[in-house]
């Protein structure tokens, strides 16, 4: 886990934003904003980050939804594992005929898993919509169907972190009803993934945390990381 955060200082900030923000009629998310430095995303496409990070604690304000595309035993196993939706290739083709329906599908589900030998048949239908949303299906061979339950469970605890045009990462790391200690552990998991990508903690310039409708507050980083 990342050592960029000091436990006591981080907990103070998290408690302050949770206790200081007015209560809403819904369970607000806790969002993380990481500002990077020394990275030129325009000149070096490899500098972009696009990863799925498994969090130690699942945010409770919204269920992460997983859809599985495949056929036969693959879909049966997905149903048993509690996938939020299972789709056969023919269903994907039918949905793709209606652009509005395809966009609705893309927006409704956070992650997609596809049976490896099925994906080439459907990529032309879903690629133009899922690609820009960074939701292209995770490939899983039919012979690895026994791994589906663990993969679905892992994705339910995961968030995607990515840079777009600017060296800034926005992601969800919790919900307002979580313990401050759990949120700090989730933040550490995200920072660890960023550190592994760039192999240099000093690439992380500033870190902010906020509730959905609350102001952002900066998290102090450990001294001497440069």
From Swiss-Prot:
Domain of life of the native organism: Archaea
Protein name: Large ribosomal subunit protein uL1
HAMAP family noted in UniProt: Ribosomal_uL1_A
Subunit structure comment from the entry: Part of the 50S ribosomal subunit.
Biological process terms in GO annotation: regulation of translation; translation
InterPro entries reported in the protein's UniProt record: Ribosomal_uL1, Ribosomal_uL1-like, Ribosomal_uL1/biogenesis, Ribosomal_uL1_3-a/b-sand, Ribosomal_uL1_arc
Family annotation (CDD domains): Ribosomal_L1
Family named by the database record: Belongs to the universal ribosomal protein uL1 family.
The protein's role, per its UniProt record: Binds directly to 23S rRNA. Probably involved in E site tRNA release. Protein L1 is also a translational repressor protein, it controls the translation of its operon by binding to its mRNA.
Source species: Korarchaeum cryptofilum (strain OPF8)
Alphabetical keyword list: Repressor, Ribonucleoprotein, Ribosomal protein, RNA-binding, rRNA-binding, Translation regulation, tRNA-binding
Record's GO cellular component terms: large ribosomal subunit
GO MF terms held by the record: rRNA binding; structural constituent of ribosome; tRNA binding
């Amino acid at each position: 886990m990342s050592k960029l955060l000091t436990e006591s200082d981080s907990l103070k900030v998290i408690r302050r934003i949770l206790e200081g923000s007015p209560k809403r009629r819904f369970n607000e998310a806790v969002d993380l904003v990481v500002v990077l430095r020394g990275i030129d995303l325009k000149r070096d496409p490899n500098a972009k980050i696009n990863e799925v990070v498994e969090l130690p604690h699942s945010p409770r304000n919204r269920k992460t939804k997983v859809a599985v595309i495949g056929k036969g035993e693959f879909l049966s196993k997905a149903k048993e594992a509690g996938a939020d939706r299972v789709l056969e290739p023919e269903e994907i083709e039918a949905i793709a005929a209606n652009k509005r329906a395809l966009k609705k599908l893309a927006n409704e589900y956070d992650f997609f898993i596809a049976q490896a030998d099925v994906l080439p048949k459907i990529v032309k239908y879903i690629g133009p919509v899922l690609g820009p949303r960074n939701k292209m299906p995770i490939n899983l061979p039919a012979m690895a169907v026994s791994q589906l339950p663990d993969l679905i469970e892992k994705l339910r605890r995961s968030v995607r972190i990515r840079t777009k045009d600017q060296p800034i990462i926005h992601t969800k790391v919790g919900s307002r009803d979580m313990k401050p200690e759990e949120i700090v552990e989730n933040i550490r998991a995200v920072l660890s993934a960023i550190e592994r990508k760039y192999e240099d903690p000093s690439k992380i310039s500033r870190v902010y945390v906020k509730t959905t409708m609350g102001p952002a507050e900066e998290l102090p980083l450990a001294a001497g990381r440069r």
